[in-house]
Amino acid sequence: MTDEADADPQPFAAPPATGAPAADKPARKPRRAAPRTSEFRIAEQPAFVLHSYPYRETSLVIDVLTRDHGRIALVAKGAKRPHSALRGVLQTFQPLSLSWSGKSELRTLTGAEWVGGMLPLAGDALLCGFYANELLVKFCAREDPHPPLFQHYLVTLTRLAHGEPPVQVLRSFERVLLRETGYAMTLKRTVARRAVEPDKLYVFDPQRGVRDAGSDAPSHWPVIAGQTLLDMEEDDYHRAQTVAQSKTLMRFLLNTYLGGTPLATRQILIDLQNL
């Protein structure tokens, strides 16, 4: 590890108790990426590897989510060599402390340490982890930090590793992801500022929010029970109807906001586990 100044002595906070996402905000377009920083060296930044691919003969490019600098790309020089210390450290779904240098879009990794304290993902949880990583790559612009999203990703991996129901964990993560990247998810009030009623039917306008179901709504907008919207607001998925309708709603919203671009891991989840 490098000995740069300003190292964070406690890079990863303990995951908070699970619960409903934060307060609602008006729907808006995704934020633009933050201007590239002028910092040449960053030391001991909490991070997770989202994806990696070969770079030249012996190196890797790693796409990482960091707490304070957002999603960035780093060159891990020599990481493919048989005896490289980085080979066993740069793993997905494990908390890391990374250091790097450079001002270009592709920076140079200068140090990496495994923080530890997290169980490995396996089975369905592993598939869900790859799905979460793909969503982060698709929705998070480079160098656009989202500390609350970083923390919720940590919580999501922890919940998956401890065997919590994947359906509930994924729906909660999807909502936080959309909110933090600019797509608010107001579920307890309609666009007319009326409270959602559990016994009524609604549709979700991707650009405006919850609307009363009616003949003027496009046919491809899913019809959702008010009870489902209220349950999602409270992160409560014990009703079978809520499980089914929340999956339909989130699939519709993610597909809309991605412009129809398919998610490879979503199709795997649909085919294997219907998550």
UniProtKB/Swiss-Prot annotation:
Residue ranges that the Swiss-Prot or TrEMBL entry lists as coiled coil: none
Highest taxon above the source species: Bacteria
Tagged with keyword Nucleus: no
Family: Belongs to the RecO family.
PANTHER family in alphabetical order: DNA REPAIR PROTEIN RECO
Disordered: annotated span: 1-38
Annotated HAMAP family: RecO (MF_00201)
Protein name: DNA repair protein RecO
General function of this protein: Involved in DNA repair and RecF pathway recombination.
Annotated Gene Ontology cellular component terms: bacterial nucleoid
Keywords: DNA damage, DNA recombination, DNA repair
Matches recorded under Gene3D superfamilies: Nucleic acid-binding proteins (2.40.50.140), Recombination protein O, C-terminal domain (1.20.1440.120)
NCBIfam families according to UniProt: reco
GO biological process: DNA recombination; double-strand break repair
Positions with biased composition (Low complexity): 8-24
Native species: Burkholderia pseudomallei (strain K96243)
